[in-house]
Amino acid sequence: RAAGEIKTKPTQQSVAKLREIGIQPDIVICRTEHDLDDDNRRKIAMFCNVEHRNIVAFRDVKHSIYECPLDLRQDKIDRLVVDNLGIDSPTPDLSDWENFVERLINPQHKVTIAVVGKYIELQDAYKSIYESLTIAGAAHHAEVTIARIDSEAIEAGDASTIIGDVDGILIPGGFGDRGIEGKILAAQYARTTGIPYLGICLGMQVATVEFARNVCNLEGAHTTECNKKTPHPVISLQEEQKGIKDMGATMRLGSCDS
């Protein structure tokens, strides 16, 4: 990047190291900001002992990572793979994916969703949540702006001021009691203002606690995870799990009888 030109030496050296341990690549995919010119492709092909047509440039995309499959198809990477494996495979229909990317790049309107959590400062802490919101937004021709709200800040301040005017509030899963009261206040703010609310795992639990306290008048209602002595345990462990000391790997996944 500093020299303003593509350097092929790192690729050649990486492939040489692979060949030293007996791995000969059939295809070399080069991550690059720009396309590879034919001279660089031929140089990589020659020094890596890979066919010229099997040198693929994986360029930076303009808008979203979801453009990558379409760019790779444009470079015929799918055909290279099936040809090298000797598989007779029909050309896939990517029209649904193309439509999704088009909606993602050219939204018709915008929405703001507040995500209230205690790991907001960590970029990837709620990565799957953020990506799910982006995908859901594209399905509805919407660009989703995410307002990251620290639940502990709500405890020390005012929910209406901190959360503000948003189109929806989402509280993701989590464990422990740190920041829990801020999440309960966020759920209350959503209920009293009519803002759409989605609670996932712990987010559903805090909505239950909030409703129990402020609508059902169950003072001190809580989950037994956060307050074992709560007078109103509206969320509790299953009877068969109450004796478990190590809570790791006890989360129920998938369908099961209840």
Regions found by a protein language model. Name each.
Residues 1-258:
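N-terminal beta1-alpha1 cap of cysteine-dependent amidohydrolase-like domains
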